[in-house]
Amino acid sequence: LTFWSGLAFGKSSDIMGIKRNPMGIKPYSSVDENLFLRGAAAEVGWKKLNFLLFGSKKMIDANLQEDSTSSDGDITVSSFQSSGTHSTIGDLENKDALEETVFGGEVSIKDRKYTIGLITALSLYNGNINRTLSPYSQFQFNSNFNWVTGAHYNWTHRNFNFFGEISRSNNNGIAQLHGLMASLHPKVSVSAFYRNYGKDYQNLFTNAVGEGSKSINEKGILTGLDFKLTK
């Protein structure tokens, strides 16, 4: 919810797919040209504590404003590009138009039955973001700076697994999720998942379970029952 840059599937019939397990530092193997990170990362464990730091700087595609003039020399962009296609003159002009700097870290305590942690990520852009916002998109990210912080937990007790996360963006938008998975019988498993993603939550690196591709403006409860006829 607070930070995710890898592949993740949305809501599906798989009741165990409601939980995203953190993968730590992994090489990016997708073909997306904008959502990956390029930089350095380090992870250190000491007893029950785990520390992770990362930093990234790269160019991303963005739509340049044709009439943009800035006294300080900064560019002005009207939107971010994510298609990765550069088949027209306009696409080529928008390629690598904006510099993105991202850095952050996580500290967590891991025990045999539980994990709790704090995570933060700071995103900076070297241009002026000036999106044309409509009433339905008035809460979208429209700045060159965003600071997201979050806390997460995971607790296992016998056949029950409780997990959740709460996150806050720089504009005070809040998003949270909480879930339960339980094995009641070798053939019967149940799950429950509550999500409340605020309409003003702003995070370009979120990929939580939900109806939409962005973890914003959603509230609901998802329940599941898995019954195996044969084993």
Q: What is each stretch, according to the model?
A:
Residues 1-231:
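Outer-membrane beta-barrel channel domains
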